[in-house]
Swiss-Prot record:
Topology class, membrane: Lipid-anchor
Similarity remark: Belongs to the protein kinase superfamily. Tyr protein kinase family. SRC subfamily.
GO MF terms, alphabetically ordered: ATP binding; metal ion binding; netrin receptor binding; non-membrane spanning protein tyrosine kinase activity; protein tyrosine kinase activity; signaling receptor binding
Catalytic activity: L-tyrosyl-[protein] + ATP = O-phospho-L-tyrosyl-[protein] + ADP + H(+)
Uppermost EC category: transferase
Residues covered by the Protein kinase domain: 262-521
Domain SH3: 71-132
Name of this protein: Tyrosine protein-kinase src-1
Residues that bear Phosphotyrosine: 416, 528
Residues noted as binding ATP in the record, renumbered to the chain: 268-276, 290
């Protein structure tokens, strides 16, 4: 099943309940002057919230929820604007304040708008509780180091652009990421500083010479003086709005939708199972629509496959929104990725990408596959044609794994045996899967190695000049494709060849692959800059 764009959380800032304002208008961007705000929340509340004792707004916006009703005076602030898409949803603008009425749903909270008095559901990852670090414009949540660097290096941002993120290696620590130069031609440089906790959660420090009761206090201080950092903090790095959790609150559970709500506007491509279209839901929301050829599978099997996709929620997996199964052809409705398949992108607009962008995309794909690996889901058709490309952040495209409608939940033996007569994309399929039909997470790792070959060659067909039967025979005899031109030797030796190990259990995990690529350029430089004396 083909699909076409995590929930990255973006902090937006607010004028509601702000007790201190830091003016950085002297660092004017070409577009506009910007003022960012620092909430001056109490120390005790901030620390207990960071310990996870509050209602869980950390990370990707999930968790918490508890028993339903909430104190009406608990106030939320909107991080982004949101337009209502259906009855029961509530529209709002960035900075609007709302009272939290019910938080029992992990993706949609029921609120009352402070100004209008209207009630309705809002996507949880579009709001934050006031006077917590999640409501701060500079807080990025749990994002990879390389993503943080791309955010502060976005075009037209000044020296001192910064964010604070939760460290992946130690969730009790934070990291301060700062743009050290504003050289637009050379892209600027970035410094990272560890923010550590004091004993007994009494505060935070970068250097023991100066401690702070809260992260807000730390930001205020270093916005006035660098005091050992590379420069003053000047401007919170802007971040992309997160992916909507669903088309609307109603479609979260009722994801069988009437097909007359869909308008198919432009055909994007054909596949073995049907066509892919660009369209709109209710004339508002851009979506991708996969139409299944009649007779491809039963409604029961179709819904079983779609249920797997519906439950998957990761920034590097395409989000499934809804289905239409009341009549044929069946539809799958997913988020729309503006730049299409990675294969076509590599052959066209992406043909000029440098090694840093290619490595970053490899890390994103491995991150999405790591999510499937953790849930014992096998993709079975991982290839550049089944990875989709969205917008760029600092020159690096956002990529997401798609077409995992073929995915199967592995049983205890960790093997899925394909039915007799099933067809496989031979050049991407591991030997044990091609010859015996045995698919595992490790056969996906083999396919990932072939996908890397596609990335490094900018979309060349694997095993050039060889037909399928020859590929099967030669691979069985030990043949492996040579190192592509321009591919770093370390990537070929430590990743591609290991992904193509004849013994499945000796192939790396996607967790290993993700961290290899995520840390690829970090290994040549100090991980964190020490503050100067």
């Amino acid at each position: 099943m083909g699909c076409l764009f995590s929930k990255e959380r973006r902090s937006g800032g607010s004028d509601m309940g702000v007790s201190e304002r830091i003016d950085v208008s002297r660092f004017q961007t070409p577009q506009q002057q910007t003022v960012f705000h620092v909430n001056n929340g109490g120390n005790e509340g901030t620390i207990s919230q960071l310990n996870g004792t509050s209602d869980g707004m950390m990370g990707n916006g999930r968790g918490g929820g508890g028993g339903g009703g909430a104190q009406e005076r608990e106030t939320l602030v909107a991080l982004y604007p949101y337009d209502s898409r259906a009855d029961g949803d509530l529209s709002f603008q960035k900075g609007d304040a709302m009272y939290l009425l019910d938080h029992s749903n992990c993706d949609w909270w029921y609120v009352r708008h402070q100004r209008t008095g209207q009630t309705g559901y809002v996507p949880r990852n579009f709001v934050a509780k006031q006077q917590t670090i999640e409501s701060e414009e500079w807080y990025a949540g749990k994002i990879p180091r390389n993503r943080a660097e791309r955010l502060v290096l976005s075009s037209h941002l000044p020296k001192g652009t910064f964010l604070i993120r939760e460290r992946e290696a130690d969730t009790r620590e934070f990291a301060l990421t700062i743009r050290d130069t504003d050289d637009q031609r050379n892209g600027g440089t970035v410094k990272h500083y560890k923010i550590k906790r004091l004993d007994h959660d009494q505060g935070y420090f970068i250097t023991t010479r100066r401690t702070f009761r809260s992260l807000q206090e730390l930001v205020r201080y270093y916005s006035d003086v660098p005091d050992g950092l590379c420069c003053q903090l000047t401007f919170p790095a802007p971040r992309l709005a997160p992916t909507r959790p669903d088309l609307s609150h109603d479609t979260q559970q009722n994801w069988e939708i009437p097909r007359n709500q869909l308008h198919l506007k432009r055909k994007l491509g054909d596949g073995n199972f049907g066509e892919v279209w660009y369209g709109k839901w209710r004339g508002i929301v851009e979506v991708a629509i996969k139409t299944m050829k009649p007779g491809t599978m039963s409604p029961e099997a179709f819904l079983q496959e779609a249920q797997i996709m519906k439950q998957c929620d990761h920034p590097n997996l395409v989000k499934l929104y809804a289905v239409c199964t009341r009549e044929e052809p069946f539809y799958i409705i997913t988020e729309y990725m503006i730049n299409g398949s990675l294969l076509q992108y590599l052959r066209t607009d992406g043909s000029t990408l440098g090694i840093q962008a290619l490595v970053d995309m490899a890390a994103q794909i491995a991150n999405g596959m790591m999510y499937l690996e953790e849930r014992k889901l096998v993709h079975r058709d991982l290839a550049a044609r089944n990875v989709l490309v969205g917008d760029k952040i600092s020159g690096v495209p956002v990529v997401k794994v798609a077409d995992f409608g073929l995915a199967r939940k592995l049983m205890e033996e960790d093997i899925y045996e394909a039915r007799t007569g099933a067809k496989f994309p031979i050049k991407w399929t591991a030997p044990e899967a091609a010859t015996c039909g045995n698919f595992t997470v490790k056969s996906d790792v083999w396919s990932y190695g072939i996908l890397l070959y596609e990335i490094m060659t900018k979309g060349q067909v694997p095993y050039p000049g060889m037909h399928n039967r020859e590929v099967v025979e030669q691979v069985e005899l030990g043949y492996r494709m040579p190192m592509p031109r321009g591919c770093p030797e370390q990537i070929y030796e430590e990743v591609l060849l290991k992904c193509w190990d004849k013994t499945p259990d000796r192939r790396p995990t996607f967790d290993t692959l993700y961290h290899f690529f995520d840390d690829y350029f970090v290994s040549t430089q100090p991980n964190y800059a020490p503050p100067s004396a």
